[in-house]
Amino acid sequence: MIRTQEFQASCKFLGVTHEEVLGYLDSKLDRANFHDVVGELVLRIRKLRPQVVLTFGQDGGLTGHADHAMAGAFATQAFEWAGRPDRYLEQLSSGLQQHAAQKLYYATADFKLPDRMPTSPPTVTARVEVGAERFERKIKAFMHHKTQEPLFARLRMSLGGMPTTEMFHLAATREPQEARLEGDLFEGVVSD
């Protein structure tokens, strides 16, 4: 309950107008039914119809947290299955249409947090300039997660100042493309 409240406070601070919490218990996502969780994410992809999906890498991202690793695994599979006519047929028979988001990115970084589980961060394939002010706003939003307070000092120390870029790894795309460093996650995306 407290983690949900922290998440909602963080979203409110950022001005997010729609957020959903799927109700899985903190630190227990690895015990959830794979097809159920992926199905819930497929449902949201089909309803919201995003062009780009962002998630953690399957190593758990910067923190190496098991829930983050599972979120990455579930989101990766949902990215693949949301566009298929042979997955979650009950959603399609209820009137939803399949939807193939065009790109899937994993959040990544060029540093590691000390005293965390070892991770294998994916190669940076996109550097998005966000500016110091936006990055600082992101950090302040993170600070609404009071239960994560022990990480704050380590994160600040690891950042070594206020970065101005966010880093991502292009994990999948619907259209073949040459490997290159992108500056915009919507580069090459075709509008519906």
Predicted regions and their residues:
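Active-site rim/loop-helix segments in enzyme catalytic domains that contact anionic ligands
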Residues: 1-48, 84
